């Protein structure tokens, strides 16, 4: 008579999480796409990422390869990414992406401030003086008047651009 196994190979308290094969494939494809994004970066930017030496070398190789060799190398990078923690890599990538959008948002803010200076005059210049106390109030007033005249006459917006350059210079100093 056969004896029944009294004890299971795992502890009953342990919860076993079964992952489907397609879910595993999706995870691997995500890692491969993350690797593709790394390949698209410049080497100077890539040096700032927390990558293992093998992965760094594989990414550098993929940047040199063309067509089919590149595709195979991207698969290799995906495989190497399985042994890496993707969170810090993804965080660094997000930081680089947001850097561009933050710079664009800052320029839009300066453009809006410039428009206010031209349209509202002294009231907006007072706001600029609060933001940038070292700004030359008289120069800003003069440029605002000139920009309004240029706009009215349909001339090129030389003063308009100069106001923006002044505001941009003060923003970069901060």
From Swiss-Prot:
Chain segments annotated as coiled-coil in the UniProt record: none
UniProt signal peptide: none
Any GO BP: assembly of large subunit precursor of preribosome
Top-rank lineage group of the source organism: Bacteria
SUPFAM superfamilies: PSPTO4464-like (SSF158710)
Subcellular location field: Cytoplasm
RNA-binding among keywords: yes
Record InterPro entries: DarP, DarP_sf
Cited function: Member of a network of 50S ribosomal subunit biogenesis factors which assembles along the 30S-50S interface, preventing incorrect 23S rRNA structures from forming. Promotes peptidyl transferase center (PTC) maturation.
PANTHER family noted in UniProt: UPF0307 PROTEIN YJGA (PTHR38101:SF1)
Family classification: Belongs to the DarP family.
Name of the protein this chain belongs to: Dual-action ribosomal maturation protein DarP
Native organism: Vibrio campbellii (strain ATCC BAA-1116)
Native organism taxonomy: Bacteria, Pseudomonadati, Pseudomonadota, Gammaproteobacteria, Vibrionales
Protein encoded by which gene: darP
């Amino acid at each position: 008579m056969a004896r029944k196994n009294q004890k299971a190979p795992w502890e009953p308290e342990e919860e076993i999480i079964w992952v489907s094969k397609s879910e595993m494939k999706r995870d691997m494809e995500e890692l491969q796409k993350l690797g593709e994004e790394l390949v698209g970066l410049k080497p100077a930017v890539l040096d700032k990422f927390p990558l293992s030496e093998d992965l760094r070398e594989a990414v550098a190789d993929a940047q040199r390869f063309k067509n089919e060799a590149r595709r195979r190398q991207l698969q290799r990078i995906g495989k190497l990414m399985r042994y890496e923690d993707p969170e810090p890599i993804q965080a660094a990538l997000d930081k680089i992406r947001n850097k561009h959008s933050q710079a664009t948002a800052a320029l839009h803010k300066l453009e809006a401030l410039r428009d206010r200076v031209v349209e509202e005059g002294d009231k907006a210049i007072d706001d600029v003086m609060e933001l940038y106390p070292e700004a030359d109030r008289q120069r800003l007033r003069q440029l605002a008047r000139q920009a309004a005249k240029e706009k009215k006459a349909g001339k090129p917006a030389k003063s308009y651009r100069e106001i923006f350059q002044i505001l941009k210079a003060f923003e970069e100093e901060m």
